[in-house]
Protein backbone atom coordinates (compact mmCIF):
# COMPACT_ATOMS: atom_id res chain seq x y z
CA UNK A 1 0.00 0.00 0.00
CA UNK A 2 1.16 3.50 -0.86
CA UNK A 3 0.76 6.22 1.75
CA UNK A 4 1.15 9.96 1.12
CA UNK A 5 2.31 11.99 4.12
CA UNK A 6 1.14 15.61 3.94
CA UNK A 7 2.52 16.95 7.25
CA UNK A 8 5.72 16.29 9.15
CA UNK A 9 5.29 14.16 12.25
CA UNK A 10 7.41 12.32 14.77
CA UNK A 11 10.05 10.18 12.97
CA UNK A 12 8.64 7.02 14.52
CA UNK A 13 5.60 7.26 12.26
CA UNK A 14 7.55 6.84 9.03
CA UNK A 15 10.01 4.41 10.58
CA UNK A 16 7.35 2.03 11.84
CA UNK A 17 5.25 2.19 8.68
CA UNK A 18 8.33 1.43 6.58
CA UNK A 19 9.11 -1.53 8.83
CA UNK A 20 5.53 -2.74 8.48
CA UNK A 21 5.93 -2.90 4.70
CA UNK A 22 4.12 0.23 3.56
CA UNK A 23 5.45 2.39 0.73
CA UNK A 24 5.69 5.92 2.09
CA UNK A 25 5.86 9.12 0.07
CA UNK A 26 6.29 12.59 1.58
CA UNK A 27 5.00 15.88 0.18
CA UNK A 28 4.99 18.75 2.64
CA UNK A 29 5.10 21.66 0.19
CA UNK A 30 2.85 21.10 -2.84
CA UNK A 31 -0.42 22.98 -3.06
CA UNK A 32 -3.73 21.26 -2.49
CA UNK A 33 -4.43 21.45 -6.23
CA UNK A 34 -1.13 19.71 -6.97
CA UNK A 35 -1.87 17.02 -4.38
CA UNK A 36 -5.30 16.45 -5.96
CA UNK A 37 -3.63 15.69 -9.29
CA UNK A 38 -1.74 12.72 -7.84
CA UNK A 39 -3.92 11.53 -4.97
CA UNK A 40 -5.43 8.82 -7.20
CA UNK A 41 -2.12 6.95 -6.87
CA UNK A 42 -2.41 6.47 -3.10
CA UNK A 43 -4.14 4.02 -0.79
CA UNK A 44 -3.75 6.19 2.30
CA UNK A 45 -2.93 9.71 3.41
CA UNK A 46 -1.68 11.01 6.73
CA UNK A 47 -2.38 14.62 7.63
CA UNK A 48 -2.57 16.96 10.63
CA UNK A 49 -4.29 20.20 9.63
CA UNK A 50 -2.53 21.34 6.46
CA UNK A 51 -5.74 21.72 4.45
CA UNK A 52 -9.30 20.44 4.46
CA UNK A 53 -10.17 17.11 2.89
CA UNK A 54 -13.37 18.10 1.11
CA UNK A 55 -15.72 16.48 -1.39
CA UNK A 56 -13.73 17.58 -4.45
CA UNK A 57 -10.50 16.22 -3.00
CA UNK A 58 -12.09 12.88 -2.14
CA UNK A 59 -13.58 12.54 -5.61
CA UNK A 60 -10.04 12.53 -7.01
CA UNK A 61 -8.90 9.89 -4.51
CA UNK A 62 -10.15 6.85 -6.41
CA UNK A 63 -7.91 4.34 -4.59
CA UNK A 64 -8.01 5.85 -1.12
CA UNK A 65 -8.68 3.34 1.65
CA UNK A 66 -7.89 5.44 4.73
CA UNK A 67 -7.17 8.91 6.05
CA UNK A 68 -4.96 9.10 9.13
CA UNK A 69 -5.49 12.32 11.11
CA UNK A 70 -2.61 12.87 13.53
CA UNK A 71 -4.81 14.50 16.14
CA UNK A 72 -8.18 14.13 17.79
CA UNK A 73 -10.74 15.88 15.60
CA UNK A 74 -12.03 15.08 12.12
CA UNK A 75 -13.85 18.36 11.42
CA UNK A 76 -11.51 19.24 8.53
CA UNK A 77 -12.56 16.07 6.70
CA UNK A 78 -15.86 15.60 4.86
CA UNK A 79 -16.66 12.49 6.87
CA UNK A 80 -19.96 11.83 5.11
CA UNK A 81 -18.36 11.62 1.67
CA UNK A 82 -15.41 9.63 3.00
CA UNK A 83 -17.70 7.05 4.58
CA UNK A 84 -19.79 6.82 1.42
CA UNK A 85 -16.59 5.85 -0.41
CA UNK A 86 -15.69 3.29 2.30
CA UNK A 87 -12.65 5.30 3.33
CA UNK A 88 -11.56 4.45 6.87
CA UNK A 89 -11.14 7.52 9.10
CA UNK A 90 -8.38 7.07 11.65
CA UNK A 91 -7.82 9.66 14.39
CA UNK A 92 -5.65 9.56 17.49
CA UNK A 93 -7.41 11.17 20.47
CA UNK A 94 -5.66 8.69 22.76
CA UNK A 95 -2.32 10.18 21.73
CA UNK A 96 -2.74 13.64 23.21
CA UNK A 97 -5.43 13.18 25.86
CA UNK A 98 -2.92 13.33 28.73
CA UNK A 99 -1.45 16.56 27.38
CA UNK A 100 -4.90 18.12 27.08
CA UNK A 101 -5.82 17.03 30.60
CA UNK A 102 -2.67 18.61 32.03
CA UNK A 103 -3.08 21.80 30.00
CA UNK A 104 -6.68 22.19 31.14
CA UNK A 105 -5.71 21.79 34.79
CA UNK A 106 -2.82 24.20 34.32
CA UNK A 107 -5.11 26.84 32.87
CA UNK A 108 -7.62 26.42 35.69
CA UNK A 109 -5.05 26.74 38.46
CA UNK A 110 -3.41 29.69 36.71
CA UNK A 111 -6.74 31.50 36.56
CA UNK A 112 -7.61 30.76 40.18
CA UNK A 113 -4.23 32.07 41.33
CA UNK A 114 -3.95 34.98 38.87
CA UNK A 115 -0.57 33.72 37.68
CA UNK A 116 -0.79 35.44 34.31
CA UNK A 117 -1.48 38.82 35.93
CA UNK A 118 1.01 38.52 38.78
CA UNK A 119 3.80 37.34 36.49
CA UNK A 120 3.45 40.47 34.36
CA UNK A 121 3.25 42.73 37.42
CA UNK A 122 6.33 41.37 39.18
CA UNK A 123 8.35 41.64 35.96
CA UNK A 124 7.39 45.33 35.89
CA UNK A 125 8.43 45.82 39.51
CA UNK A 126 4.85 45.83 40.84
CA UNK A 127 4.43 43.90 44.11
CA UNK A 128 0.74 43.53 44.97
CA UNK A 129 -0.33 40.86 47.42
CA UNK A 130 -3.80 41.64 48.73
CA UNK A 131 -5.02 42.53 45.24
CA UNK A 132 -3.83 39.13 44.02
CA UNK A 133 -5.38 36.79 46.56
CA UNK A 134 -6.21 33.58 44.78
CA UNK A 135 -9.09 31.13 44.95
CA UNK A 136 -8.72 27.50 46.03
CA UNK A 137 -10.03 24.65 43.93
CA UNK A 138 -11.02 22.52 46.92
CA UNK A 139 -14.73 22.66 47.66
CA UNK A 140 -15.66 23.58 44.10
CA UNK A 141 -17.81 21.69 41.61
CA UNK A 142 -16.30 21.11 38.18
CA UNK A 143 -18.64 20.60 35.24
CA UNK A 144 -17.33 18.85 32.13
CA UNK A 145 -19.20 18.86 28.83
CA UNK A 146 -17.99 16.02 26.64
CA UNK A 147 -16.74 12.97 28.52
CA UNK A 148 -14.60 11.21 25.94
CA UNK A 149 -10.82 10.86 25.89
CA UNK A 150 -10.12 14.50 26.81
CA UNK A 151 -12.84 14.91 29.40
CA UNK A 152 -11.85 11.68 31.12
CA UNK A 153 -8.20 12.74 31.17
CA UNK A 154 -9.05 16.05 32.83
CA UNK A 155 -11.25 14.34 35.42
CA UNK A 156 -8.42 11.94 36.21
CA UNK A 157 -6.06 14.87 36.84
CA UNK A 158 -8.55 16.29 39.35
CA UNK A 159 -8.51 13.23 41.63
CA UNK A 160 -6.14 14.83 44.14
CA UNK A 161 -8.52 17.70 44.91
CA UNK A 162 -11.40 17.73 47.37
CA UNK A 163 -14.00 18.59 44.75
CA UNK A 164 -17.09 17.25 42.99
CA UNK A 165 -16.72 16.46 39.29
CA UNK A 166 -19.82 16.25 37.11
CA UNK A 167 -20.10 15.56 33.40
CA UNK A 168 -22.69 15.85 30.68
CA UNK A 169 -22.46 13.79 27.50
CA UNK A 170 -25.00 12.82 24.85
CA UNK A 171 -23.85 9.21 25.22
CA UNK A 172 -25.38 7.36 28.18
CA UNK A 173 -23.43 5.64 30.95
CA UNK A 174 -20.04 7.26 30.36
CA UNK A 175 -19.50 8.33 33.98
CA UNK A 176 -16.81 6.56 35.97
CA UNK A 177 -15.03 6.60 39.32
CA UNK A 178 -13.65 10.07 38.54
CA UNK A 179 -16.84 11.77 37.44
CA UNK A 180 -20.60 11.54 37.94
CA UNK A 181 -22.69 11.83 34.79
CA UNK A 182 -25.65 14.19 35.21
CA UNK A 183 -28.19 16.07 33.14
CA UNK A 184 -27.16 19.35 31.57
CA UNK A 185 -29.61 21.09 33.87
CA UNK A 186 -27.98 19.69 36.99
CA UNK A 187 -24.53 20.60 35.71
CA UNK A 188 -25.64 24.19 35.11
CA UNK A 189 -27.14 24.34 38.58
CA UNK A 190 -24.07 23.13 40.47
CA UNK A 191 -20.93 24.00 38.47
CA UNK A 192 -18.38 26.56 39.62
CA UNK A 193 -16.20 25.71 36.62
CA UNK A 194 -17.23 24.67 33.11
CA UNK A 195 -14.64 22.81 31.05
CA UNK A 196 -15.40 22.02 27.41
CA UNK A 197 -14.19 18.76 25.89
CA UNK A 198 -16.75 18.10 23.15
CA UNK A 199 -15.93 17.69 19.44
CA UNK A 200 -17.00 20.21 16.84
CA UNK A 201 -20.45 19.24 15.57
CA UNK A 202 -23.61 21.02 14.49
CA UNK A 203 -24.85 20.56 18.06
CA UNK A 204 -21.80 22.10 19.75
CA UNK A 205 -21.12 24.95 17.33
CA UNK A 206 -21.96 28.28 19.04
CA UNK A 207 -23.24 26.32 22.02
CA UNK A 208 -21.78 28.73 24.58
CA UNK A 209 -23.85 31.82 23.87
CA UNK A 210 -25.52 34.42 26.08
CA UNK A 211 -28.58 32.30 26.75
CA UNK A 212 -26.43 29.31 27.72
CA UNK A 213 -24.14 31.39 29.91
CA UNK A 214 -26.98 33.05 31.79
CA UNK A 215 -28.69 29.71 32.43
CA UNK A 216 -26.02 28.80 35.01
CA UNK A 217 -27.10 29.24 38.61
CA UNK A 218 -23.68 30.41 39.80
CA UNK A 219 -21.12 32.73 38.37
CA UNK A 220 -18.47 30.43 36.89
CA UNK A 221 -15.07 30.02 35.26
CA UNK A 222 -14.89 28.76 31.68
CA UNK A 223 -12.12 26.60 30.24
CA UNK A 224 -12.08 25.65 26.55
CA UNK A 225 -9.39 23.27 25.32
CA UNK A 226 -11.72 21.64 22.79
CA UNK A 227 -12.95 23.57 19.75
CA UNK A 228 -13.10 27.35 19.36
CA UNK A 229 -16.37 27.43 17.47
CA UNK A 230 -18.21 26.08 20.49
CA UNK A 231 -17.99 29.55 22.06
CA UNK A 232 -19.52 32.75 20.70
CA UNK A 233 -16.71 35.11 21.64
CA UNK A 234 -18.76 38.30 21.75
CA UNK A 235 -21.19 36.58 24.14
CA UNK A 236 -18.28 35.35 26.23
CA UNK A 237 -17.05 38.94 26.50
CA UNK A 238 -20.49 40.08 27.64
CA UNK A 239 -20.38 37.37 30.30
CA UNK A 240 -16.94 38.48 31.45
CA UNK A 241 -17.99 42.13 31.63
CA UNK A 242 -21.12 41.32 33.63
CA UNK A 243 -19.23 39.04 36.04
CA UNK A 244 -21.32 36.00 35.15
CA UNK A 245 -18.11 34.46 33.85
CA UNK A 246 -15.41 34.97 36.46
CA UNK A 247 -12.54 34.17 34.13
CA UNK A 248 -11.75 32.22 30.97
CA UNK A 249 -8.92 29.96 29.87
CA UNK A 250 -8.99 29.54 26.10
CA UNK A 251 -6.64 27.30 24.15
CA UNK A 252 -8.89 27.58 21.09
CA UNK A 253 -10.74 30.48 19.47
CA UNK A 254 -13.68 30.71 17.11
CA UNK A 255 -11.57 32.83 14.74
CA UNK A 256 -9.22 29.99 13.84
CA UNK A 257 -9.55 28.95 10.22
CA UNK A 258 -7.97 25.68 11.24
CA UNK A 259 -5.86 24.57 14.16
CA UNK A 260 -2.47 25.91 13.11
CA UNK A 261 -3.01 28.65 10.53
CA UNK A 262 -2.25 32.30 11.17
CA UNK A 263 -5.14 33.60 13.24
CA UNK A 264 -5.45 37.00 11.55
CA UNK A 265 -4.12 36.73 8.02
CA UNK A 266 -5.82 40.02 7.03
CA UNK A 267 -4.92 41.84 10.25
CA UNK A 268 -8.58 42.38 11.06
CA UNK A 269 -8.79 41.82 14.79
CA UNK A 270 -12.38 41.41 16.05
CA UNK A 271 -13.42 43.75 18.87
CA UNK A 272 -14.25 40.80 21.12
CA UNK A 273 -10.73 39.47 20.74
CA UNK A 274 -9.28 42.90 21.51
CA UNK A 275 -11.06 42.65 24.85
CA UNK A 276 -9.76 39.14 25.54
CA UNK A 277 -6.11 40.07 25.00
CA UNK A 278 -6.35 42.94 27.51
CA UNK A 279 -8.50 41.24 30.16
CA UNK A 280 -6.62 40.25 33.31
CA UNK A 281 -8.94 37.32 33.98
CA UNK A 282 -8.46 35.73 30.56
CA UNK A 283 -5.68 33.27 29.76
CA UNK A 284 -4.94 32.43 26.12
CA UNK A 285 -2.79 29.83 24.38
CA UNK A 286 -2.44 29.05 20.64
CA UNK A 287 -4.19 25.65 20.37
CA UNK A 288 -1.32 23.82 22.06
CA UNK A 289 -3.28 21.93 24.71
CA UNK A 290 -2.40 18.62 23.09
CA UNK A 291 0.95 19.82 21.76
CA UNK A 292 3.75 18.40 23.90
CA UNK A 293 7.02 16.60 23.21
CA UNK A 294 5.48 13.41 24.54
CA UNK A 295 2.18 13.68 22.67
CA UNK A 296 3.98 14.15 19.36
CA UNK A 297 5.38 10.64 19.66
CA UNK A 298 2.21 9.18 21.20
CA UNK A 299 0.09 10.52 18.34
CA UNK A 300 2.42 8.95 15.79
CA UNK A 301 2.45 5.62 17.61
CA UNK A 302 -1.34 5.61 17.89
CA UNK A 303 -1.84 6.23 14.17
CA UNK A 304 0.69 3.54 13.24
CA UNK A 305 -0.91 0.99 15.55
CA UNK A 306 -4.38 1.61 14.11
CA UNK A 307 -3.15 1.42 10.51
CA UNK A 308 -1.37 -1.85 11.23
CA UNK A 309 -4.49 -3.38 12.75
CA UNK A 310 -6.65 -2.41 9.77
CA UNK A 311 -4.34 -2.73 6.81
CA UNK A 312 -0.90 -4.21 7.46
CA UNK A 313 -0.01 -7.67 6.24
CA UNK A 314 2.70 -7.67 8.89
CA UNK A 315 0.50 -7.22 11.93
CA UNK A 316 2.39 -6.87 15.18
Feature locations, PLM:
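Short, Asp-centered acidic motifs that coordinate Mg2+ and/or phosphate
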Residues: 43-44, 66, 193, 221, ...
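Rossmann-like dinucleotide/phosphate-binding beta-alpha-beta segment
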Residues: 1, 130-218
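Short, conserved active-site loop motifs that form the nucleotide-linked donor/cofactor pocket
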Residues: 22, 87, 179, 245, ...
Amino acid sequence: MKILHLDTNHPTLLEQLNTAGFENHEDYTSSKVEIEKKIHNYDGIIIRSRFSIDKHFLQQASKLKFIGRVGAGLENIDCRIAKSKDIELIAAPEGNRNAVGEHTLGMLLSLFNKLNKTDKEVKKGVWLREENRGVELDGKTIGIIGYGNMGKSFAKKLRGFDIEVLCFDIKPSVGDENCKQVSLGELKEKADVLSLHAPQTARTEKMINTSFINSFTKNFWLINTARGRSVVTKDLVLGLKSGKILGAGLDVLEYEKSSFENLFSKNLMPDAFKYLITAENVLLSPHVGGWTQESKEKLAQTIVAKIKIKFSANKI
